[in-house]
């Protein structure tokens, strides 16, 4: 029980930090943190809650299928299936899904992925190669959640990663809450930089990687 309370506090503090950046507009987004590995349980944000408020009903404990462990009237977030896929296929400890203007704009510029290279902050992703290039996959925003989950699952390849959903934010995961937040901050910085650079250069050149 002590572990559950400790994880709850960590997730609540993380929610406050991300809320202060306006990364949960209009109740959007969801976050989770692993509580136990065997059996797999994790805390996830409840659906439809105003994340600018802190209440006892902010999160609920769910199992490996995303079903509530304890009796509750709360509903887990609609995208819980994305979190279950990550926890079931990796050793990740925290998953963050946020909607920002920049990550939505990026998904309207490119079709299958966005490629960014030679930025110092890429090292925050534990990539130390000089002049490194990263590729962030983009999937379609399928209304049918199981279909969205299947498209998403194809890009779960390690204990840390990120997937953009067209017009539906980014999902980032890492080994723990610190790692996941650091990665999310890095991606959002890179998206903001990329969009600003394109605005100076005159936009995305037409080609295979141009969605507009």
Swiss-Prot record:
One of its GO terms (biological process) is L-methionine salvage from methylthioadenosine. Pathway: Amino-acid biosynthesis; L-methionine biosynthesis via salvage pathway; L-methionine from S-methyl-5-thio-alpha-D-ribose 1-phosphate: step 2/6. It comes from the Bacteria. InterPro entries: Aldolase_II/adducin_N, Aldolase_II/adducin_N_sf, MethylthioRu-1-P_deHdtase_MtnB. It holds the Pfam family Aldolase_II. Belongs to the aldolase class II family. MtnB subfamily. This is Methylthioribulose-1-phosphate dehydratase. The lineage of its organism: Bacteria, Bacillati, Bacillota, Bacilli, Bacillales.
């Amino acid at each position: 029980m002590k572990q559950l309370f400790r994880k709850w506090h960590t997730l609540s503090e993380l929610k406050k930090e991300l809320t202060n950046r306006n990364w949960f507009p209009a109740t959007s987004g969801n976050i989770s943190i692993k509580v136990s590995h065997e059996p797999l349980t994790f805390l996830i944000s409840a659906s439809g809650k105003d994340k600018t408020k802190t209440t006892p009903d902010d999160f609920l404990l769910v199992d490996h299928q995303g079903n509530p462990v304890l009796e509750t009237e709360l509903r887990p977030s609609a995208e819980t299936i994305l979190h279950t896929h990550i926890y079931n296929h990796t050793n990740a400890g925290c998953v963050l899904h946020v909607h920002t203007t920049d990550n939505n704009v990026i998904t309207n510029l490119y079709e299958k992925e966005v490629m960014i290279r030679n930025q110092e902050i890429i090292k925050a992703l534990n990539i130390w190669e000089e002049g490194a290039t990263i590729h962030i996959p983009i999937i379609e925003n399928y209304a049918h959640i199981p279909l969205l989950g299947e498209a998403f699952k194809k890009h779960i390849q390690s204990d840390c990663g990120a997937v953009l959903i067209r017009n539906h934010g980014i999902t980032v995961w890492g080994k723990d809450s610190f790692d996941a937040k650091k990665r999310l901050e890095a991606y959002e910085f890179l998206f903001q930089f990329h969009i600003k650079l394109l605005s100076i250069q005159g936009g995305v050149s037409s080609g295979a990687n141009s969605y507009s």
